[in-house]
């Protein structure tokens, strides 16, 4: 099995190192990751400038081929597939921080898996709750390996990827979940530069309902959350009603 490993925290993150080294148990591994932090960039693809794709031996992957890209996580997957050959599995992470609920819409970690899935490759995004006193990437990587092995052996339906979140503590087990309403309520902080001109930081505080059976509910109770995510964003349940709503509409 050939496994492409990427992330959004950058190639020097301890999370991608743990994930990449763990994946060696499944076969041939190659790492393609951003050369700097790319958190919250979403599924952006770089089309207005050239990209650099450089081999690196300084990221701690040993004999695993590793490449750094001055682009987004999705860029990394595109270049990895086209320059290094099509993998059998794409894994992204392990992200420093959870990607729950509506986080998926801006997560670079999930975007790498989305790109893999859009190319028809079974793909998984892994994220770790960093609210604990110790970040146990090794334990998360053990679970990631077990999940990746199952997907590698049994496959995923076309157009479906997995979004996996690990709790801050040692996992009690694994639960298959649905997405929660977890999100960040944006806050805009205004400050002044030395010339007295305003500049802004966008921050946010976590919000959302902790409903039973959701990813947020599972992770907060110490379980590994595994959520199937579909590339098809159509609101199928609203199609018929929308036809009625728009009946007779014309300029």
Curated annotation (Swiss-Prot):
Domain of life: Bacteria
Keyword Nucleotide-binding: yes
Catalytic function, reaction form: a ribonucleoside 5'-phosphate + H2O = a ribonucleoside + phosphate
Top-tier EC class: hydrolase
Binding residues for a divalent metal cation: 8-9, 39, 95
Cofactor(s) required for function per UniProt: a divalent metal cation
Signal sequence coordinates: none
Keywords: Cytoplasm, Hydrolase, Metal-binding, Nucleotide-binding
Cofactor binding: number and manner: Binds 1 divalent metal cation per subunit.
Pfam family, one: SurE
Main location: cytoplasm
GO cellular component: cytoplasm
Gene Ontology MF term list: 3'-nucleotidase activity; 5'-nucleotidase activity; exopolyphosphatase activity; metal ion binding; nucleotide binding
NCBIfam families per UniProt: PRK00346.1-4, surE
HAMAP family: SurE
PANTHER family: 5'-NUCLEOTIDASE SURE, 5'_3'-NUCLEOTIDASE SURE
Family: Belongs to the SurE nucleotidase family.
Protein name in the entry: 5'-nucleotidase SurE 1
């Amino acid at each position: 099995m050939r496994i492409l490993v990427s992330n959004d925290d950058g190639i020097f993150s301890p999370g991608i190192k743990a994930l990449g080294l763990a994946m060696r148990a499944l076969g041939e591994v190659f790492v393609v990751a951003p050369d700097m932090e790319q958190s919250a960039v979403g599924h952006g693809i770089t089309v207005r400038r050239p990209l650099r794709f450089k081999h690196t031996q300084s990221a701690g992957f040993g004999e695993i081929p590793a490449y750094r890209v001055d682009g987004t996580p999705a860029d990394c997957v595109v270049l990895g597939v086209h320059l290094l050959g099509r993998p059998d599995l794409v894994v992204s992470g392990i992200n420093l921080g959870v990607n729950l609920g509506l986080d998926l819409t801006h997560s670079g970690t999930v975007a790498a898996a989305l790109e893999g899935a859009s190319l028809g490759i079974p793909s998984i995004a892994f994220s770790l709750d960093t609210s604990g006193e110790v970040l146990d990437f090794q334990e998360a990587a053990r679970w990631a390996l077990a999940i990746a092995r199952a997907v590698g052996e049994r496959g995923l339906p076309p157009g479906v990827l997995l979004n996996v979140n690990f709790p801050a503590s040692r996992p009690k087990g694994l639960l298959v979940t649905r997405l929660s309403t977890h999100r960040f309520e944006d806050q805009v902080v205004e400050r002044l530069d030395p010339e007295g001109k305003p500049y802004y930081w966008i921050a946010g505080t976590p919000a959302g309902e902790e409903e039973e059976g959701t990813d947020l509910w599972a992770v907060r109770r110490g379980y590994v959350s595994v959520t199937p995510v579909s590339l098809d964003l159509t609101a199928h349940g609203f199609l018929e009603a929308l036809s009625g709503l728009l009946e007779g509409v014309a300029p």
